[in-house]
């Protein structure tokens, strides 16, 4: 069953960008053209800080757990950390496998880049790691005060990447699927690591 799930996820990631048509460029063009200093500043802030948030949260959890000698918090930090790092590594591999051109490069007359990226477009690494962070936190702490901010955060990251002109809708959808999928895999990996490190 797990093999079939992995097959369908990989198939989705390879085929989706190939099937995407001009509707994606039009959607990015629409979002990319939103006016106002708030949306510009908010989007820029979310995009620039996402990698630091994704890595910083599990590191802070680990530091606090170590200082307080809280083994459960250390286990949680390991789960969140492996989810984020594993997702990022997988996303980078898929990026160069698919090698999709960025929206602002493919449609320079239609989409204005608010930021510039050097790697390929699909999937969105920012969205993938944000979803990995949010999903792992929600699995470990299934409370409304964790779930609600997490949902707002991942939505903001996904939208900001399209506003910046650096991703298509299927890029962020692929990133979201990858983040959730890798986190589920990390859930089982962290169980094995916990036995080796803490038991």
In which residue ranges do the predicted regions lie?
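Small-polar-interrupted transmembrane alpha-helices in polytopic inner-membrane proteins
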Residues: 82-96, 148-160
């Amino acid at each position: 069953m797990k093999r079939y799930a992995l097959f369908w996820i990989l198939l989705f990631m390879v085929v989706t960008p190939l099937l995407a048509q001009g509707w994606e460029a039009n959607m990015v063009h629409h979002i990319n053209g939103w006016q106002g200093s708030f949306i510009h500043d908010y989007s820029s802030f979310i995009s620039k800080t996402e990698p630091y948030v994704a890595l910083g949260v599990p590191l802070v959890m680990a530091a606090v757990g170590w200082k307080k000698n809280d083994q459960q918090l250390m286990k949680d930090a390991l789960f969140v950390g492996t989810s984020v790092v594993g997702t990022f590594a997988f996303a980078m591999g898929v990026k160069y496998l698919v090698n999709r051109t960025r929206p602002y490069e493919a449609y320079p007359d239609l989409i204005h880049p608010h930021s510039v990226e050097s790697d390929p477009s699909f999937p969105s690494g920012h969205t993938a790691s944000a979803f990995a962070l949010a999903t792992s936190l929600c699995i470990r702490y299934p409370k409304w005060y964790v779930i609600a901010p997490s949902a707002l955060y991942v939505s903001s990251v996904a939208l900001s990447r399209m506003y910046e002109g650096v991703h298509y809708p299927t890029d962020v959808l692929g990133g979201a699927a990858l983040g959730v999928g890798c986190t589920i895999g990390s859930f089982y990996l962290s169980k094995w690591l916990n036995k080796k490190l803490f038991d």
